[in-house]
C-alpha cells in the first residue's frame, strides 16, 4: 500500500513539473511578440453594438464627420456603431453622460477641441476632457470662418472693424460661451481693438445660423460645411478663415493672419472612452482610426466638406491637449 502511495505521489509531482515547464515555455515564446499585439490577441472587441455619442444636433460638421467615421468602423469590425445626438450644456451633458458609462469599450464620446479645451480652460466644464476620459485618437481637422450677410451694411472686414471701433459694443456677434466662438471673439477683440456685443443665440451651428439669417446677429463664425450653399448663392460674405494657411479648395478666402490679425483656431475631432477603458481596446480602435484617416474614400468625403483627415494617437492627444489647455488658461486669465 505504501509503495502504491509513493508511486502515486511521484506521478503527481512529475505531472506538475511538466505542466510548469510547459507554462514557462509558452510564456517565453509570447514574450518575443509585440506587446500590443499580444494584448490585443486576447481581446475580442467589439462583439456588440457600440454607441457613439456626440454633443450636437444632426446635420452639422461634428455629426457628419462622426457618421463618416462610424460607417468605416462598421465596415471594418462588422458591428453597428450607433450615433446618438445629445445636445445641451454646450456639449457638457453628452460628455458627462459618456463619462458615467461603464469603461467596457461600448460607449464613445465624439467631440472637437474647439469646444472641449475652451470649456476646460475657462472652467465652464468642471472636469478634464483628457484626465477624466481615456483618449483614443483624432480623426479629422476643420477650420472656422467668420462671415456677414450680403444684405448687411459692410462689404469687407475693414468696414466692419471701422464701425465696431466707432460704436463699441454695438456690432452683434454670435458667441457660445466656452466654445471656439468664445475664443475667436476674444482674439478678434484683442487684435482688432474692438468690442463686440456677444449674444447667445443657440449652441449648434443650425440654431445660430437661423438667428443670423433672422438678423439677430451681424457676425457669425462657423465651419464652411454649414454655409457653403449660402455663400455660393451670394447670401453670405466670408470675411476670413482662422487658420495658419488658406483652406484646400478655398484658396480665394484670406486667412486672418494675412489680413493683419493673428487669430488662429483649428478644430480637431476626437474619440474618447470613459476613463479606465482597457488599453487593449484603446489600441484596437486607435489603429482602426489610423487606417480610416489613410483611406482614400474617407479623405475624399472629408474634402467635400472642406475638412482633412488628421490622426493623433493617445499619447500625442494627451500631451498636446494638456498644453493647449494650459495656453488657453493663461490667455483667459
Labelled PLM ranges:
Residues 47-49, 190-192, 196, 279-333:
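An extracytoplasmic/periplasmic, membrane-proximal ligand-sensing/linker region
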Residues 226-294, 319, 323-326:
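C-terminal lobe and pocket-closing loops
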Residues 100-106, 121-207, 256, 268-301:
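Hinge/capping helix and adjacent helix->loop/strand transition within the periplasmic-binding protein
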Residues 85, 102, 156, 215-216, ...:
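Conserved functional loop/turn residues at catalytic and ligand-binding sites
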Residues 114-124, 186-191, 214, 219-252:
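A ligand-binding cleft/hinge motif common to bilobed small-molecule-binding domains
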Amino acid at each position: 500500500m505504501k509503495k502504491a502511495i509513493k508511486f502515486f505521489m511521484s506521478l503527481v509531482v512529475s505531472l506538475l513539473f511538466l505542466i510548469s515547464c510547459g507554462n514557462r515555455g509558452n510564456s517565453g515564446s509570447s514574450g518575443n511578440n509585440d506587446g500590443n499585439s499580444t494584448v490585443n490577441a486576447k481581446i475580442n472587441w467589439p462583439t456588440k453594438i457600440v454607441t457613439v455619442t456626440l454633443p450636437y444636433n444632426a446635420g452639422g460638421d461634428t455629426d457628419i464627420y462622426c457618421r463618416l467615421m462610424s460607417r468605416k468602423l462598421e465596415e471594418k469590425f462588422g458591428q453597428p456603431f450607433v450615433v446618438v445626438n445629445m445636445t445641451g450644456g454646450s456639449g457638457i451633458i453628452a460628455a458627462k453622460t459618456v463619462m458615467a458609462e461603464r469603461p467596457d469599450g461600448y460607449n464613445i464620446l465624439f467631440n472637437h477641441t474647439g469646444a472641449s479645451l475652451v470649456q476646460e480652460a475657462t472652467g465652464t466644464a468642471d472636469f478634464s476632457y483628457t484626465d477624466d476620459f481615456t483618449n483614443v485618437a483624432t480623426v479629422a481637422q476643420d477650420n472656422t470662418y467668420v462671415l456677414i450677410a450680403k444684405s448687411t451694411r459692410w462689404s469687407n472686414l475693414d468696414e466692419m472693424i471701422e464701425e465696431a471701433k466707432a460704436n463699441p459694443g454695438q456690432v452683434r456677434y454670435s458667441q457660445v460661451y466656452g466654445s471656439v466662438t468664445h475664443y475667436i471673439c476674444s482674439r478678434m477683440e484683442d487684435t482688432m481693438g474692438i468690442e463686440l456685443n456677444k449674444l447667445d443665440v443657440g449652441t449648434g451651428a443650425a440654431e445660430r445660423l437661423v438667428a443670423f439669417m433672422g438678423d439677430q446677429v451681424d457676425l457669425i463664425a462657423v465651419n464652411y460645411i454649414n454655409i457653403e450653399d449660402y455663400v455660393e448663392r451670394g447670401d453670405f460674405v466670408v470675411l476670413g478663415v482662422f487658420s495658419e494657411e488658406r483652406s484646400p479648395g478655398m484658396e480665394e478666402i484670406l486667412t486672418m493672419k494675412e489680413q493683419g490679425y493673428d487669430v488662429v483656431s483649428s478644430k480637431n475631432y476626437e474619440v474618447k472612452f470613459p476613463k479606465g477603458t482597457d488599453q487593449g481596446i484603446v489600441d484596437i480602435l486607435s489603429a482602426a482610426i489610423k487606417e480610416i484617416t489613410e483611406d482614400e474614400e474617407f479623405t475624399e468625403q472629408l474634402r467635400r466638406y472642406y475638412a482633412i483627415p488628421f490622426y493623433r494617437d493617445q499619447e500625442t492627444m494627451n500631451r498636446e491637449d494638456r498644453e493647449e489647455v494650459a495656453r488657453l488658461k493663461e490667455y483667459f486669465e
